[in-house]
């Protein structure tokens, strides 16, 4: 492993800033720590609130991530309070948390790491703790002690697995005291502890320790067949994609029975090689690489026995059977190891391995599903490396359970922001590059939805998606070119949604076009163009959505953005009004057909939404002004004055109506028409 340390950069930094710097260097190495794992510390002397010099431990706070950690993420704990505990023999978890809260230098500061006492009990000023893949590879095999002796000799000491907390902190301190010549300590099936007189020394010790492990692994793996070789042939990319498209919605529906999840698909070479191997059915069911992975991946993945299955329907049935088996076994695992106050979480898997196809991962959002995927990649690496030395081993089931349901570990998950109204939902919005569609996409995303933005203007759709991800986070939106008049283009857009997020919950069918002319002078191509976009387009999009929602089996919402003209057509606006009337009838039929499947279909009728609108082109403005006998400059004010409230209708107003119909606030509403027109009496629904 290459050291990332730069004296040029480090020489400018003070003690605490140096700790932040080193922590980020460690966090940048994903083979050392992943997604909030690991911690670092530095013992300093600071002045307290009375100006007295006080020995303080600055340690990473619980839930913060080393790769992006800041000064504020290192709460200070008084060392005299920490060292006073060396005389204790036992201390409960909650007692430890409460004690450390009273020992904080900064009142109301971040909660210190659950491994704070471990850092404090080590005498050296600087301490680094990682969950390095290379080290865990050496300890997670049945020859671990022999392997460690061969790689490190007497330089490094090893400690058998213990759950983080007071007991392991005491044991680490005692073990280091008994071996003063040791340069590092390895926690079996957990990670590393290195130390030094300075942050640089502790960092260098970590890099040197890992490098020796990596060299040993590379030497041991040379010429060896990994995972026993193939058991199932890896299918061709096109076939894997087709099977993923068939499996993902059904899998997402099954995993979302209690709470919806986002599902991602990974058919990268490391994943398919592992999932399709001879060893995978066995080694995948041994356990996690490190205990902290369990809060994301659970103890085990769901392995689907797909050796003899050729088509999507047979594979789907096998996945369903594997999920039922996983649920039974997970529930039994919980009952066998539960402790007082432990509450059964979702008993379904976060990782599903399908030989020959790839891996599906599930999470509360795209980011979390990605974390699960990333962690399992590391697990695959560890299994492969450890198996080169002997039989892969992991935590016993009871130890894994105690971490998976440990309140101090679960605390990290409580630091996430509260879920919003549309959290865990997937929406597809057509015509999302501008105007109403853009406003709806942004509004749904603001309420937590993952949004696929489709538009014939692909670049505009991408811009909308980038606006969304800039506001709410990476992975929350996808922009793509989508022509709603093209069956192939519509199908490709829905496939993109499935591959990105696993399925669909909300369709907002909004794309439209307008042409104004008297019937007598209208060209056939203009009439047909209006029906292609404003009628056929909604049919193609809705048909694909209903197929997908039905496959998922968890209901959904269809929201059609129609127009006031459905109820009150306008002079010289026949092509638009007639096509939009067809759209509205389609929506009502879908309310009838979708109800048995929990699929709701509703309509929004806006009027005269000019802002950011491509529908109201200069030609259409000119044509509509002529039809009303007014100047073009008077058009917007004319429409405002004709509604009862005399208000201008904005895209954001329509977005609020779409949000209502897309959300559970309207869970008992279908076949409804909601007007957003300021009150046009001719367009009253009843």
Spans of features found by a protein language model:
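Alpha-helical segment proximal to the catalytic Tyr-Lys
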Residues: 547, 592-593, 667
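Active-site loop immediately N-terminal to the catalytic Tyr-X3-Lys motif
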Residues: 520, 568-574, 596, 646, ...
